[in-house]
Amino acid sequence: MLEADLVSKMLRAVLQSHKNGIVLPRLQGEYRSLTGDWIPFKQLGYPTLEAYLRSVPAVVRIEASRSGEIVCYAVACTETARIAQLVARQRTSKRKIGRQINCQMRVKKAMPFFLEGKPKATLRQPGFASDYSISRKPNSALLRDRGSALGVKADVDMPPYPDTPVQRHASMSANSRFSPKSSLPASFQTHISRACPTEVNDNLNQTVEKPNITPPASYTNKMDEVQNRIKEILDKHNNGIWISKLPHFYKEFYKEDLNQGVLQQFEHWPHICTVEKPCGGGQDSLLYPARREQPLKSDQDPEKELPPPPPAPKQEVPSQGSPAVMPDVKEKVAELLGKYSSGLWASALPKAFEDMYKVKFPEDALKNLASLSDVCTINYISGNTQKAILYAKLPLPTDKILKDEGQAQGDFDIKSMIEQEYLQIEKNMAESADEFLEDITVPPLVIPTEASPSVLVVELSNTNDVVIRYVGKDYSAAQELMEDEMKEFYSKNPRVTPIQTVHVGQLLAVNAEEDAWLRAQIISTDENKIKVCYVDYGFCENIEKSKAYRLNPRFCSLSFQATKCKLAGLEVLNDDPDLVKAVESLTCGKIFAVEILDKSDVPLVVLYDTSGEDDININATCLKAICDRSLQVHLQVDAMYTNVKVTNICSDGTLYCQVPCKGLNKLNDLLHKTEDYFHCKHMTSEYFISLPFCGKICLFHCKGKWLRVEITNVHSSRALDVQFLDSGNSTSVKVSELREIPPRFLQEMLAIPPQAIKCCLADLPQSIGMWTPDAVLWLRDSVLNCSDCSIKVTKMDETKGVAYVYLFTPNNFPDPHRSINRQITNADLWKHQKDVFLSAVSTAASSPGNRNGGTPAPGSPAESLRKSHPEVIKKSVLDHTSSFSLEELPPPVHLSRSGEHMDVYVPVACHPGHFVIQPWQEIHKLEVLMEEMILYYSVSEERHIAVERDQVYAAKVENKWYRVLLKGILTNGLVSVYELDYGKHELVNIRKVQPLVDVFRKLPFQAVTAQLAGVKCSQWSEEASMVFRNHVEKKALVALVQTVVEHTNPWDRKVVLYLVDTSLPDTDTWIHDFMSQYLLELSKVN
């Protein structure tokens, strides 16, 4: 029974550390990562784990997720209510504050085949880097509220200090089993923790002593360096520092992260620091320099060094009635302490005394520490008479030995006088620092280097003057730490008083609302009030002079966080009231991902709202919001429209039409004027697109005239995707083919809404996927680019922006039985092309009594067609012979011979036994090939071909075209392909597979399967694979070829090689050495 209770407690602890629950298959692994054991459900009498979990409803709550997975949640009890509250208050990026914010853009990289970094041409002296450091990405930050001052709260997760093992003396939970990864070096733990995060168990009261594990000798110097650094930090903060703030100062001073485990060791480092627990009982503690009672010792001249004053009276707690300590014992204690220059804990004195003198230390002397005060200095911790540190007294000249109490009192008076002088000196230094504060230069704000940083939009006066704040560890998080320190400094420092004289431009510390302390700069002054700008928030406010204080220099090291930017694409309309209002309503007070186009003093940016399922381009959205509504087509239900032009027909049957209206007439007039303008005026470089970005509207010359297009995706500096605003077509073009709209027509051109209207044929089933090629071709031949068609609107879907219409050709208008809708339903092509089902009776879909709408009834011909759809595809693939002959394959890519080096890039890595490399020298040719394939296949006619396994094709994967090997054909219309240049396996629609033309068969396939040499392992664990991937995937490395295994098919070639990371400044890291060391450490743990 005790075992069952123990398992229940541990299970609740595991579940409580996961706010969002744990899926059932992962529960055993999470339990074992914390306890070292599996859940013994069979020993407890249950056949399955789920049966055991359902037997303890007071511990586990089981629910089914939307995807059908079983998820386990913790059930709080009285004992663990406090823990549940703490977990609920965790500040993570998933917590909703106002709305959920995803600060990571889902927008794909403009050029996924673009590589960052370059391997070095030659290797330095090979060697294994034991202090391999790994950078970790900071967590996303959160929006917080500071009254009128907008703020950002970040959850900063400090990574472990590299290669710093921590020797713990503190107690641990009885059920906290030894974790395999706890004994690995920090460089390994960093990678493992990404897949197996360490969980914290707060639910156990029983404790046992953890064995004292001595760190390896190679780490001793590292620990000494950490201790010396902490001592330097404390020397700069004589008044103490909160332990929770120490990692921030450590990172700021030494540009390294402090291992969180070090924070638990301070009580055992009396020679480094003194720890005091505040009386309030909070979780945080204060940290002081060691031997704080002698603040002036290091500041005095060694030749004039004063003797140490006696301990303060409050530290001497004599024990009445205790026997006196023998003089010989005191002499031995003084001699013993002389060997401990950093002090000795009183509890350790008996053991050290006995080890040195082979004599037992008197027990009464330990109970009466005050009796030893004449031979040592006693520093009581938190007033506890049983917890103290003993320091040896410095030897004094015999003529100055203190013999009586009066002399001691006089010496105490000297100490008090020195302390007063020290405080006065500190005050004078603070005042002098204030006098020279105006000469201090605050460092400029550095634009983040990451691809899509997050920003908080504060306010704007126009679109060229938008005030933002960057969100992140080095920005909003650092600012919040600084503000907490400001609050502590100004609230608890009695010497700080409001400023008396002020002048414009002066920096201040302002006591704002909710007792917040913010940095500000004076804009203007009045008799009793001053107008300040909060330099970290970007807004202004009139405040009383009594709330303004001098800004201490220590708070000037962080850059002003409020900065300005310009919204790309809105420059010409930057002060338009409607535009400013639209931008303000969509952006102010919200966090966005930002694409920085130009990193100038005022950056040019594009904002993306990533809080929903799709990323929304805010710049483009605001531009469309201010279009002239009077120039937009307003279709009415049951209305008839003539002279309609069908401009585009999609493969799913969707139509785009142009309906005559005022906006279309004005657009055509403007485009004619633009044509004349370009014809008469010499085309200069100012009209070429120098900075393409998504959402930009420009001109493209097509079929002898200029058309409006919007950039939808930037592949590279040469190729991009555009959508024709007024026809609905999409294509890929070269950047050099686009032109800027002339300034004289720009404002009018932007005011005209898109003239392409999205339509669907009424009474035909919707959302059925692709139509057959024959059906789409028939529809295109019938109505595409016909300028005198007619439509009748039957329904408007405002949410989707779709009009449901009957479509008529000129000869059939207005007979509904001869509409395109009826013709396509009754056409003979559906009898032999059964990829799509259509309702033969139009009234059934629109009848009020038909609840299924356009869905065919079971047993109907349409339902039969739907069921036969996969078989039809499979049969057509097998029966039809390809009309395109297979060209010869390109030669295999060149690889270095055995024993030679080559520069490589690793696009994909599974484990050391299987990964993919690309020769670095050939990558620029692959980039050019990718661009050319995008441009070619985006404008070429889609061909319906019969595909075969193990043949080479071109396939479209996520808007880009790749050279692929077809590996398999599925029955649901999908095919499995292998990217021959990148080594990835993908599933694509069979319609996205096209013949690979001869011009794209000349470059050798770039992906080569590889195996890491120098390591022997038959089966790689998930953790080992993760470590390997983190070291090599998407990195440029140097390879030393051992063996090349040739094959007739270039995609079956294999190379066995060594990999070397040369990115570190002082050493080369051989990956096989690193993995061998990892396996060795793991085997020791197991």
Swiss-Prot record:
<dbReference type="GO" id="GO:0005737">
    <property type="term" value="C:cytoplasm"/>
</dbReference>
<keyword id="KW-0217">Developmental protein</keyword>
<keyword id="KW-0677">Repeat</keyword>
<dbReference type="GO" id="GO:0033391">
    <property type="term" value="C:chromatoid body"/>
</dbReference>
<feature type="domain" description="HTH OST-type 1">
    <location>
        <begin position="3"/>
        <end position="76"/>
    </location>
</feature>
<keyword id="KW-0694">RNA-binding</keyword>
<dbReference type="InterPro" id="IPR050621">
    <property type="entry name" value="Tudor_domain_containing"/>
</dbReference>
<dbReference type="GO" id="GO:0035770">
    <property type="term" value="C:ribonucleoprotein granule"/>
</dbReference>
<dbReference type="GO" id="GO:0003729">
    <property type="term" value="F:mRNA binding"/>
</dbReference>
<dbReference type="InterPro" id="IPR037978">
    <property type="entry name" value="TDRD7_LOTUS_3"/>
</dbReference>
<feature type="domain" description="Tudor 1">
    <location>
        <begin position="501"/>
        <end position="558"/>
    </location>
</feature>
<dbReference type="GO" id="GO:1990904">
    <property type="term" value="C:ribonucleoprotein complex"/>
</dbReference>
<dbReference type="Pfam" id="PF12872">
    <property type="entry name" value="OST-HTH"/>
</dbReference>
<feature type="region of interest" description="Interaction with CABLES1">
    <location>
        <begin position="881"/>
        <end position="1086"/>
    </location>
</feature>
<dbReference type="GO" id="GO:0043186">
    <property type="term" value="C:P granule"/>
</dbReference>
<feature type="region of interest" description="Interaction with CDK17">
    <location>
        <begin position="849"/>
        <end position="1086"/>
    </location>
</feature>
<keyword id="KW-0963">Cytoplasm</keyword>
<feature type="domain" description="Tudor 2">
    <location>
        <begin position="691"/>
        <end position="748"/>
    </location>
</feature>
<feature type="domain" description="HTH OST-type 3">
    <location>
        <begin position="325"/>
        <end position="394"/>
    </location>
</feature>
<feature type="domain" description="HTH OST-type 2">
    <location>
        <begin position="222"/>
        <end position="291"/>
    </location>
</feature>
<dbReference type="InterPro" id="IPR002999">
    <property type="entry name" value="Tudor"/>
</dbReference>
<keyword id="KW-0898">Cataract</keyword>
<dbReference type="GO" id="GO:0002089">
    <property type="term" value="P:lens morphogenesis in camera-type eye"/>
</dbReference>
<dbReference type="GO" id="GO:0007281">
    <property type="term" value="P:germ cell development"/>
</dbReference>
<feature type="region of interest" description="Disordered">
    <location>
        <begin position="295"/>
        <end position="324"/>
    </location>
</feature>
<dbReference type="InterPro" id="IPR047449">
    <property type="entry name" value="Tudor_TDRD7_rpt3"/>
</dbReference>
<dbReference type="InterPro" id="IPR041966">
    <property type="entry name" value="LOTUS-like"/>
</dbReference>
<keyword id="KW-0221">Differentiation</keyword>
<dbReference type="InterPro" id="IPR035437">
    <property type="entry name" value="SNase_OB-fold_sf"/>
</dbReference>
<dbReference type="GO" id="GO:0007283">
    <property type="term" value="P:spermatogenesis"/>
</dbReference>
<feature type="compositionally biased region" description="Basic and acidic residues">
    <location>
        <begin position="295"/>
        <end position="306"/>
    </location>
</feature>
<keyword id="KW-0744">Spermatogenesis</keyword>
<comment type="similarity">
    <text>Belongs to the TDRD7 family.</text>
</comment>
<dbReference type="InterPro" id="IPR025605">
    <property type="entry name" value="OST-HTH/LOTUS_dom"/>
</dbReference>
<feature type="modified residue" description="Phosphoserine">
    <location>
        <position position="847"/>
    </location>
</feature>
<comment type="subunit">
    <text>Found in a mRNP complex, at least composed of TDRD1, TDRD6, TDRD7 and DDX4. Found in a complex containing CABLES1, CDK16 and CDK17. Interacts with CABLES1, CDK17 and PIWIL1.</text>
</comment>
<keyword id="KW-0597">Phosphoprotein</keyword>
<dbReference type="Pfam" id="PF00567">
    <property type="entry name" value="TUDOR"/>
</dbReference>
<dbReference type="InterPro" id="IPR047448">
    <property type="entry name" value="Tudor_TDRD7_rpt2"/>
</dbReference>
<dbReference type="GO" id="GO:0070306">
    <property type="term" value="P:lens fiber cell differentiation"/>
</dbReference>
<protein>
    <recommendedName>
        <fullName>Tudor domain-containing protein 7</fullName>
    </recommendedName>
</protein>
<feature type="region of interest" description="Disordered">
    <location>
        <begin position="844"/>
        <end position="866"/>
    </location>
</feature>
